[in-house]
């Protein structure tokens, strides 16, 4: 019973992570927002199928953190996975 519960929780967390990581992070007007800046030129190819953004961490302002805004039908940390489950595909 305990193993079954743990498996369900892990599956839930994985699905939640995938959904959250594939959500667009642009503002309503298409702006990056105050804590998201364009990536430096050396990170131009960081995202496989999307746009790179430099996320300014509020708790560690000097630490660089890069994220991707994925193109349509792509998901993942660096937009490298084609989302075949997308109903618009």
Curated annotation (Swiss-Prot):
Keywords tagged on the record: Disulfide bond, EGF-like domain, Neurotoxin, Secreted, Signal, Toxin
Coiled coil: none
Molecular function, one GO term: toxin activity
Annotated signal sequence range: 1-30
Disulfide bridges in this chain: 39-52, 47-68, 70-79
Location of the protein in the cell: Secreted
Chief localisation class: secreted
Domain EGF-like: 43-80
Expressed in which tissues: Expressed by the venom gland.
Keyword Hydrolase among record annotations: no
Gene3D superfamilies (alphabetical): Laminin
GO cellular component: extracellular region
Function: Ant peptide with probable defensive activity which acts as a potent agonist of the mammalian epidermal growth factor receptor (EGFR). Mimics, both structurally and functionally, vertebrate epidermal growth factor (EGF) peptide hormones. In vivo, intraplantar injection in mice causes long-lasting (several days) hypersensitivity of the injected paw to both mechanical and thermal stimuli. Its long-lasting effect is unusual for venom toxins whose effects are usually immediate.
Family according to the record: Belongs to the EGF domain peptide family.
Protein name: OMEGA-ectatommitoxin(02)-Rm1a
Organism listed in the record: Rhytidoponera metallica
């Amino acid at each position: 019973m305990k193993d079954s519960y743990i498996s369900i929780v892990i599956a839930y967390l994985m699905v939640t992570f995938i959904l959250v990581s594939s959500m667009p992070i642009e503002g309503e007007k298409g702006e990056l927002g105050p804590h998201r800046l364009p990536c430096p030129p050396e990170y131009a190819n960081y995202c496989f199928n999307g746009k790179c953004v430099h996320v300014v961490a509020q708790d560690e302002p000097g630490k660089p953190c890069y994220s991707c805004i994925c193109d349509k039908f792509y998901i993942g940390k660096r937009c490298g996975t084609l989302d075949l489950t997308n109903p618009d595909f």
